[in-house]
């Protein structure tokens, strides 16, 4: 399917893979055990297709996912996801070296609460400390970016990695910020965030989706919201700082 789409569209493209799309060959490889070996086939295929790869860690759909991963107070579960994310960054670094172009790895975790919690500050402090540990390893062939979300299904009351949390973290630590157009209030103009964030973060990663009432990922249209987003990048002279 990807090859068919690639054959119909002009220009060159990048493919963003989640860790769960590794080629595991029927072997039971848990997420804290994954290595670049599970992605060498993707790397070679992308080279043949004249495409570059980007990457994502995957915190959801796992027995240890629950409602908290990197912000989990249980050290055993938290360390499992920290190790997973560290390994994903190393895989991204190997991809970047292979394709002679930095692989951008997005970190989004589903962490949150279905109902009101009094532990908001505690969970966010744990998430901060986890990210500090993960991002401490310097890897020259990849870039990391962090993605916020308003809420998720089953986690309606509270999201640990909110826009405020990640905007502050990225600004303080000089990390790329991910803007997903489906991760904000339906009445918000995500384009308004571009000029503000660019004053404080080095680069932006854009996930351009089309939400209906929530993060529904309808097929993207060249509508006013999409047009405004890219117009703001042009006005900010920041096309070279957005991905």
Model segments located where?
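Short, glycine/acidic-enriched loop or turn micro-motifs at the edges of active sites
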Residues: 183
């Amino acid at each position: 399917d990807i090859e068919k789409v690639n054959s119909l569209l002009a220009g060159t493209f990048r493919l963003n893979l989640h860790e769960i799309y590794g080629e595991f060959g029927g072997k039971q490889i848990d997420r804290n055990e994954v290595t670049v070996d599970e992605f060498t086939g993707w790397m070679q295929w992308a080279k043949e297709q004249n495409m570059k790869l980007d990457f994502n860690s995957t915190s959801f759909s796992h027995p240890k996912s629950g409602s908290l991963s990197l912000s989990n107070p249980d050290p055993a579960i938290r360390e499992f996801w920290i190790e997973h994310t560290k390994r994903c960054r190393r895989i991204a670094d190997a991809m970047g070296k292979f394709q002679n172009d930095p692989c951008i790895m997005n970190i989004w975790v589903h962490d949150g609460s279905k109902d009101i919690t009094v532990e908001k500050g505690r969970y966010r402090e744990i998430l901060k400390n986890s990210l500090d540990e993960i991002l401490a390893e310097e890897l020259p062939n990849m870039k990391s970016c962090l993605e916020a979300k308003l809420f998720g299904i089953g986690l309606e009351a509270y999201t640990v990695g909110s826009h405020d949390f990640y905007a502050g973290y990225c600004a303080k630590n000089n990390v790329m910020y991910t803007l997903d157009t489906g991760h904000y209030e339906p009445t918000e103009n995500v384009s308004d965030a571009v000029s503000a964030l660019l004053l404080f973060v080095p680069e932006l990663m854009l996930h351009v989706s089309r939400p209906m009432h929530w993060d529904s990922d309808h097929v993207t249209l060249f509508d006013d919201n999409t047009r405004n987003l890219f117009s703001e990048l042009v006005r900010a002279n920041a096309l070279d700082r957005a991905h």
